[in-house]
């Protein structure tokens, strides 16, 4: 389940769940034989010792473990416990990586060579000693964290069930999970020195409670409350409950909940000891570490899964507050409460606070259960603990998968770039995927075609990898696959096999536990496979290659453009294309007249015989069969779906309606907070009118009615509120803006505002600047009609309507009636 390094006894603590007992329990097993190491590029250990003797440098004792504190003359070589000569393939020999091509070894004739493996006593000694080796020559794999190194070398599959004879059960293990959240009493920015925890919210299969020390009368949630005496008892009870679980879900628990809990516990001299291992008296103290701008909160023996980085990794949202993620995943509008409002709710015994606290834990639990199976599959594929992979971005997961594959091939991995190399890499830019300007306006009877995993397929079929990219195409075809295409080939072959198994289960109507496991596995493989191309272009990557990235996008453009050309020869008219897919309709004009007439709208499609949806799909699949026979092995164009109607505005901005009425919007969404409800609602209504009914006049009427209602004062002021977040202190803003002026007014009235607050305001009538006319709802007089027409209602819809040939002036004033076929 979990790994931790115990510096006291120089062992790796391995926590696992013994499921063979009547009541499963957590056990601790110690691994003391595995030692830290790194590689030095020499075949003679004596050279290393001679070099270090020549340095005659003493170690900075502050960097070492306590046992060395009294040693006043410790030398670098004293930290080395052993050096052995081994034979390895050194990957860096075969890649450019800043070298001249004449210095690159021939990968076609790759071979192992002798190199020194240097062992040390403590994991942190690796980086210390490596610093002294910079003048000596190349050293490798000095920056792989010790516990992750252990997982790679020992080939341990995490998050899996092992039988007594060491066989792996592929089913997703049953883990006892609980969600943890808390509420504070703070009127300003939370301050752990003075602001108490007033509620802890916990939700699991068998325990759903808000723990607090204040009585709330007449609440429907009273049955979900556990009362304690005070904050000290609340913290103690929280620890006692949490330590009973295998997995703890939080939402931003790394950066907030656990660090705050620890600071409050320190005030009461409570140690956050989550001792849950039945066969050990060893304390399991929470460890809070810092990496970059973020912290990590690790509990030995319990898997802490912070769902915030997972949501950022797997969801494409504008905001990542808990409420936004709940809406995205479960289509539920979860109530939001600003933490500055909680003190008043607490003092007045507002039972809304109980509901809010309870739902925080409930939806964190639901979200955790939603993501857990997928994260378990990531953990297994990458061969790293669940705690670690849940905090990795896609590129980091790809890198550890490649480190694993490199070890399996007896290969020493390349190093990460130095600071100067990183800066050079970050300057590199190249042409991206092919994007074709759309046929603007409304289109009907549309098919969507996409390449299945285009970039991964190109990497495999063209054998593109940092060690192969220096060879010509024909040479690469006859070579052994490089590490990138080889890894991808294994992943995609596995996914193809899984999809066949899933198809079989669907036909047999077997939607069982195995179906769920396979579905999560194929999703995780898809994410990892599609991340390899991005990884190659990531400046911090070990296997970085700008040449590979450039070659892949170039071939991607070639394949999509050639496929579009063949689709149009077949009888389609391509409406829009982007990177790895395109939308098309049947080209009736070309079919009947033998040529395209894109600019001649006199002969309308309604006068020509139309294909039925079924006939169009049959033709589409016939085209796919032919094109896929011509494509390289492993590359496949797929039918993604049929759309009743589509609205195309410009590149990256379009909307479509599926046959079942579901609307897909890309790039047109009004999602920023600084759009009022009236702006969002108007745009959504316009898109729906155009897609559901194909009714341009209705869309125009919706806009005109909104403008008329604004002019008549018939709009609820709540729908005019604009919401903008303060991203820094008021004094730090060099220029003014509406939300800054409102924040100043709030302070002048005696209330507090702080960084992170969302300021909601209305723009009122007047002759002063827009910023000066921004007011809170309760102080707002008549709103500025022209401001809302010109800056809120029209901007989100004007580009849509202009793509249909309707001007801004026509929207503001009464205009002629339109027919749909004028815009096709």
From Swiss-Prot:
InterPro entries in UniProt: DNA-dir_DNA_pol_B (IPR006172), DNA-dir_DNA_pol_B_CS (IPR017964), DNA-dir_DNA_pol_B_exonuc (IPR006133), DNA-dir_DNA_pol_B_multi_dom (IPR006134), DNA/RNA_pol_sf (IPR043502), DNA_pol_B_thumb (IPR042087), DNA_pol_palm_dom_sf (IPR023211), DNA_pol_type-B (IPR050240)
Leading EC class: transferase
Database matches in Pfam families: DNA_pol_B, DNA_pol_B_exo1
An example Gene Ontology molecular-function term: nucleotide binding
A biological-process GO annotation: DNA-templated DNA replication
Cystines in this chain: none
Keyword Transferase: yes
EC numbers for this chain: 2.7.7.7
Keyword match Cell membrane: no
Keyword list, A-Z: DNA replication, DNA-binding, DNA-directed DNA polymerase, Nucleotidyltransferase, Transferase
Catalytic reactions of this protein: DNA(n) + a 2'-deoxyribonucleoside 5'-triphosphate = DNA(n+1) + diphosphate
Matching PANTHER family: DNA POLYMERASE CATALYTIC SUBUNIT (PTHR10322), DNA POLYMERASE DELTA CATALYTIC SUBUNIT (PTHR10322:SF23)
Entry's family note: Belongs to the DNA polymerase type-B family.
Name the UniProt record assigns to this protein: DNA polymerase
Gene: pol
């Amino acid at each position: 389940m979990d790994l931790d390094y115990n510096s006291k006894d120089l062992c790796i603590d391995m926590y696992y769940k013994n499921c063979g007992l009547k009541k499963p329990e957590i056990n601790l097993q110690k691994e003391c034989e595995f030692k830290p190491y790194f590689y030095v590029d020499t075949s003679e250990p004596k050279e290393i010792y001679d070099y270090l003797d020549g340095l005659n440098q003493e170690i900075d004792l502050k960097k070492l473990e306590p046992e060395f504190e009294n040693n006043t003359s410790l030398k670098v070589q004293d930290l080395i416990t052993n050096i052995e000569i081994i034979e390895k393939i050194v990957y860096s020999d075969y890649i450019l990586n800043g070298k001249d091509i004449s210095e690159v070894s021939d990968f076609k004739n790759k071979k192992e060579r002798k190199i020194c493996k240097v062992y040390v006593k403590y994991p942190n000694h690796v980086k210390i000693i490596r610093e002294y080796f910079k003048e000596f020559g190349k050293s490798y794999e000095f920056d792989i964290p010790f516990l992750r190194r252990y997982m790679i070398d020992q080939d341990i599959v995490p998050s899996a069930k092992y039988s007594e004879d060491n066989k792996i059960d592929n089913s997703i293990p049953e883990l006892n999970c609980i969600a943890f959240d808390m509420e504070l009493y703070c009127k300003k920015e939370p301050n752990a020195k003075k602001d108490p925890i007033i509620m802890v919210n916990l939700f699991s299969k068998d325990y759903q409670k808000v723990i607090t020390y204040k009585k709330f009368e007449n609440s429907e949630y009273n049955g979900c409350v556990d009362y304690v005496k005070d904050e000290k008892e609340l913290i103690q009870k929280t620890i006692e409950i949490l330590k009973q679980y295998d997995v703890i879900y939080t939402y931003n628990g790394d950066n907030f909940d656990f660090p705050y809990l620890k600071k409050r516990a320190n005030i009461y001299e409570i140690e956050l000891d989550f001792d849950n291992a039945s066969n050990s008296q060893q304390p399991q103290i929470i460890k809070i570490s810092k990496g970059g701008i973020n912290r990590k909160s690790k509990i030995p023996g319990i898997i802490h899964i912070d769902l915030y980085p997972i949501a950022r990794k797997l969801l494409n949202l504008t905001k990542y507050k808990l409420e936004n993620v709940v809406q995205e995943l479960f289509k539920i509008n979860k109530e939001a409460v600003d933490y500055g409002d909680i003190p008043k709710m607490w003092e007045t015994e507002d039972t809304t606070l109980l509901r809010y606290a309870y739902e925080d834990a409930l939806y964190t639990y639901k979200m955790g259960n939603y993501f857990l199976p997928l994260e378990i599959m990531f953990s297994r594929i990458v061969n790293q603990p669940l705690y670690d992979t849940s905090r990795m971005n896609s590129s980091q997961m790809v890198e550890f998968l490649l480190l694993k594959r490199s070890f399996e091939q007896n290969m020493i991995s390349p190093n990460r770039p130095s600071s100067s190399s990183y800066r050079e890499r970050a300057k590199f830019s190249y042409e991206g995927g092919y994007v074709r300007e759309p046929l603007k306006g409304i289109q009907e009877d549309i098919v969507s075609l996409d390449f299945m995993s285009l970039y991964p397929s190109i990497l495999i079929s063209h054998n593109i990898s940092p060690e192969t990219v220096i060879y010509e195409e024909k040479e690469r075809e006859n070579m052994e696959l490089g590490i990138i295409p080889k890894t991808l080939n294994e992943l995609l072959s596995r996914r193809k096999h899984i999809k066949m198994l899933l198809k079989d289960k669907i036909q047999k109507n077997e939607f069982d536990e195995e179906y769920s496991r396979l579905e999560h596995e194929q999703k995780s493989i898809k994410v990892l496979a599609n991340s390899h191309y991005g990884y190659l272009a990531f400046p911090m990557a070990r296997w970085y290659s700008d040449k590979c990235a450039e070659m892949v996008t170039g071939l991607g453009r070639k394949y999509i453009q050639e496929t579009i050309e063949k689709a149009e020869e077949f009888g389609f008219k391509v409406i829009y294309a982007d990177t790895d897919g395109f939308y098309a309709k049947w080209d009736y004009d070309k079919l009947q007249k033998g040529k395209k007439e894109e600019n001649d709208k006199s002969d309308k499609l309604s006068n020509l015989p139309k294909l039925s949806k079924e006939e169009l799909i049959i033709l589409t699949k016939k085209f796919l069969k032919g094109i896929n026979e011509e494509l390289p092995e492993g590359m496949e164009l797929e039918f993604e779906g049929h759309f009743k109607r589509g609205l195309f505005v410009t590149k990256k901005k379009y909307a479509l309606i599926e046959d079942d009425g579901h609307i897909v919007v890309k790039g047109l969404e009004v999602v920023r907070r600084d759009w009022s409800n009236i702006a969002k609602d108007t745009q959504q209504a316009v898109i729906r009118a155009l897609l559901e009914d194909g009714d341009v006049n209705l869309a125009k009427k919706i806009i005109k009615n909104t403008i008329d209602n604004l002019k008549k004062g018939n709009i609820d002021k709540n729908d005019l509120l604009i919401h903008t977040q303060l991203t820094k202190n008021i004094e730090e803003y060099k220029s003014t803006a509406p939300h800054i002026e409102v924040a100043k007014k709030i302070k002048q009235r005696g209330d507090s505002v702080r960084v992170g607050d969302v300021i909601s305001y209305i723009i009122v009538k007047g002759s002063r600047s827009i910023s000066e006319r921004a007011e809170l709802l309760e102080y707002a007089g008549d709103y500025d009609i022209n401001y809302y027409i010109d800056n809120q209602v029209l901007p989100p819809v004007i580009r849509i309507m202009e793509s249909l040939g309707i001007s801004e002036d026509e929207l503001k004033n009464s205009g002629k009636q339109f027919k749909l076929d004028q815009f096709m």
